[in-house]
Amino acid sequence: MSGGIEALELKEDDIRLMVAAKVHLGSTNANYQMQQYVYDRNDEGNHIIHLNKTWEKLLLAARAICAIENPADVVIIGGQPTWQRGALKFGHYTGTTSVPGRFTPGAFTNQIQSGFKEPRLLIVCDPKGDHQPVREGSAVNIPVIGFCNTDSPLQCVDIGIPCNNDKYSIALMLWMLAREVRRIWGLDPRSQPGDVIMDLFLMREHVDEPPEGPEGEAQEPPFEQGKFDAAEAEAPEWPAESVSPRCWNAGARFRWCWWQLDSLRCKG
């Protein structure tokens, strides 16, 4: 899709980002339809994706998005938690409709449903994981753009972008796709970095830190595993009146069944 135009060619900085995010590193399995995008295979058995073909498919997907008059008619779905932030930021910078989290079945085919949508273009982060919206989109003639790994099926996918679809690779690819869409629209010039920030597309990992004391030092937790001594523990004292010498079933009410009553009558 670059057509030999220098402005549309893959830059060296973008190649470094793609290699750092492991966009080129596919899985150990490869679908027969994805073999055309595989460049080689490393010693660990992972398939290496051709980055030039990834860039060409990215340009094609950006042109398909820009062909839609209303950006809100483009729906992007991020099924897994690691893709939700990237899907939300992509919708924020491009004006598309983002659906983070679980996709409700029937959202494209059931008109009675409250969340029914009629998009003109669908973007999924994983055609294999998000197979439900892909199949519903194909049933109602919605074009599908998917970020496909080497083991992803291409059935019902119109534009497949070959790349690794883990959290870092998907964040980078969504950022590059949003940047290219804004460049085609004329919002961001190609000579400048633009307003789209890459770090906002990454999923933040929450790390639990120990509480700090009054002097800023980390406090020791009140109980640690392995420090409990059963010999030092004091056994509770039971009161003498808690156990009664009488029968345990004294005062209990018995409910007789009809067959038990008949047996007593026969004996009498």
UniProtKB/Swiss-Prot annotation:
Intracellular or extracellular location(s): Cytoplasm
The entry's keywords: Cytoplasm, Ribonucleoprotein, Ribosomal protein
Signal peptide location: none
Keyword Phosphoprotein: no
Domain of life according to the entry: Eukaryota
Laminin-binding: annotated segments: 161-179
InterPro entries given in the database record: Ribosomal_uS2 (IPR001865), Ribosomal_uS2_CS (IPR018130), Ribosomal_uS2_euk (IPR027498), Ribosomal_uS2_euk/arc (IPR005707), Ribosomal_uS2_flav_dom_sf (IPR023591)
MF term (GO), any: structural constituent of ribosome
BP GO terms, sorted: ribosomal small subunit assembly; translation
Main location: cytoplasm
Pfam families membership: Ribosomal_S2 (PF00318)
PROSITE patterns: RIBOSOMAL_S2_1 (PS00962), RIBOSOMAL_S2_2 (PS00963)
GO cellular component: cytosolic small ribosomal subunit
The protein's role, per its UniProt record: Required for the assembly and/or stability of the 40S ribosomal subunit. Required for the processing of the 20S rRNA-precursor to mature 18S rRNA in a late step of the maturation of 40S ribosomal subunits. Binds laminin.
PANTHER family linked: 40S RIBOSOMAL PROTEIN SA
Family statement: Belongs to the universal ribosomal protein uS2 family.
Subunit details: Component of the small ribosomal subunit. Mature ribosomes consist of a small (40S) and a large (60S) subunit. The 40S subunit contains about 33 different proteins and 1 molecule of RNA (18S). The 60S subunit contains about 49 different proteins and 3 molecules of RNA (28S, 5.8S and 5S). Interacts with ribosomal protein S21.
Name of the protein described by the UniProt record: Small ribosomal subunit protein uS2
Source species of the chain: Echinococcus granulosus (Hydatid tapeworm)
